[in-house]
A protein has these predicted regions:
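Conserved Class I SAM-dependent methyltransferase catalytic core
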Residues: 140-197, 211
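Short catalytic/ligand-binding loop motif for oxyanion handling, primarily in non-cytosolic enzymes
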Residues: 57, 119-123, 168-173, 220-221
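Internal, well-ordered alpha/beta segment that forms a basic, Gly-enriched binding/recognition surface
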Residues: 111-126, 145, 151-152, 160-161
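Short amphipathic alpha-helix with an adjacent loop that forms part of the alpha/beta core around
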Residues: 95-108
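Class I S-adenosyl-L-methionine
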Residues: 1-80, 86-87, 92, 97, ...
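Flexible, glycine-/basic-rich loop-and-beta segments that form/coincide
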Residues: 204-264
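Mobile active-site "lid"/loop adjacent to the S-adenosyl-L-methionine
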Residues: 119-141
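C-terminal target-recognition/interaction regions appended to catalytic cores
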Residues: 267-392
Length: 392
């Protein structure tokens, strides 16, 4: 069995444990990040609380005082043969969290490293089976990774250098869930890479972060994250969240609430979405009212026409980098060029081709469009592609 990939786990077990074992390039990156903290520091302990097969400790850190913990008995059995068994803990790292549990003195300078599990226990399991995150009450979250971040604060780690989804930071709702962690730690370095570096992840790639945090009583705000300069792995490019305008607050993403209009006056709905990844994965317009359907009206049709255009034509080489963001947009230009997106959608969307001609005429009239059937769709498409390219 390779020390950086647990071949004893089948796909279902990997999903349940949230475990994807780590390529050496990422392990080396973590080691480089923590090196300055290992110099001139006495009484330092390095801890991987979701250690798997020990990849993060074995390469270069075995000479330091360390601890490795994992809940998988087979991984623990393997690690115990490779390391000092007295420093290996086959336990759930999220239960009864305390330094004493891992024989870590209060006075020790604690550096936590690793690739903790991350998955949404409400949605990641197959066949309708729901996951259970067994942890201390103050660590509870539907995502295992968020619970691990909270556990680092409970252990009062001095340094945290781990891999985790970028979405934990760049989605404000997720950031707020970090609670005690964000209030006591500050991001110092962050390098983004694609999930495709991990063996066995799904078809939809998403951004993951090599993150270095220092314990800091001032913590960090979402505005700090919005303006943080993230690097991209093996690239000179940077990612700065505040440089991107999104549809948040401009286009509704979710089905109607109790007091909202429930039925579309033009018989059109748009499938709900969370971010770019879900927008591209899901269908677009639908003709029948549905629990996942957003009500489309004449007045907001152009916004969903823009979404359809974006879904279809936004395909940059590094699309994985933007997948967890809400759809990108230049609101001022979309308001100016409504007709462009409406016309493209009328001509290209298969559902719009099935709808009653009377509805198409209503839409065209509302937006003052001449629906010339001879007009070349490719020229409209190319114009939209140019505009979408300028968003990144």
């Amino acid at each position: 069995m390779l020390i950086d990939y647990a071949e004893h786990l089948n796909k279902a077990e990997i999903i349940k444990l949230g475990s994807y074992y780590t390529p050496q390039i990422l392990v080396d990156k973590v080691h480089n990040y923590i090196q300055p903290y290992l110099k001139n520091k006495k009484n330092t302990i390095i801890f991987d609380s979701a250690g798997g097969c020990g990849a993060f400790i074995t390469r270069g850190l075995k000479d330091y005082d360390y601890r490795i913990a994992d809940k998988d008995p087979q991984a623990c059995s393997f690690v115990s043969k490779q390391f000092n068994a007295e420093k290996v803990y086959c336990v759930n790292s999220l239960e009864n969290v305390d330094r004493k549990k891992f024989s870590i003195p209060k006075s020790s300078f604690l550096i936590i490293i690793g690739n903790p599990p991350y998955n949404d226990t409400t949605s990641e399991f197959k066949s309708g089976e729901k996951g259970v995150n067994i942890c201390d009450d103050d660590l509870k979250d539907r995502d295992l990774g968020v619970s691990f971040l909270k556990s680092y604060n409970k252990l009062k780690a001095d340094i945290v250098c781990i891999l985790h989804p970028l979405s934990y930071l760049i989605k404000e709702a997720n950031f707020k869930r970090l609670k005690g962690f964000k209030d006591n730690y500050k991001l110092i370095k962050g390098e983004i890479f694609s999930s495709e570096l991990f063996k066995g992840t799904g078809k939809i790639k998403f951004p993951i972060l090599v993150a270095l945090y220092e314990r800091n009583s001032d913590g960090m705000t979402f505005d700090y994250i919005r303006n943080f300069r993230f690097n991209l792995l093996n690239s000179n490019k940077e990612f700065i969240l505040s440089h991107y305008e999104t549809t948040d607050g401009y286009i509704n993403k979710y089905p109607p609430r109790k007091n909202d209009i429930q039925k579309s006056p033009i018989g059109l709905y748009y499938w709900t979405f969370r971010d770019i990844n879900s927008l591209k994965k899901n269908t677009s317009f639908i003709l029948n009212k549905h629990v996942n359907g957003i009500v489309v009206t004449l007045e907001n049709f152009y916004k969903y026409a823009y979404l359809y255009s974006f879904k279809t034509l936004f395909n940059p080489d590094e699309i994985w980098l933007y997948g967890n963001l809400s759809p990108l947009i230049d609101i001022r230009k979309v308001e100016r060029d409504k007709k462009l997106y409406v016309l493209y959608t009328i001509k290209n969307n298969p559902v719009l081709k099935e709808i009653k001609p009377m509805i198409i005429r209503k839409i065209a009239k509302f937006y003052n469009i001449e629906n010339n059937k001879r007009e070349d769709v490719s020229s409209i498409e190319n114009e939209i592609k140019k505009r979408l390219k300028k968003l990144i």
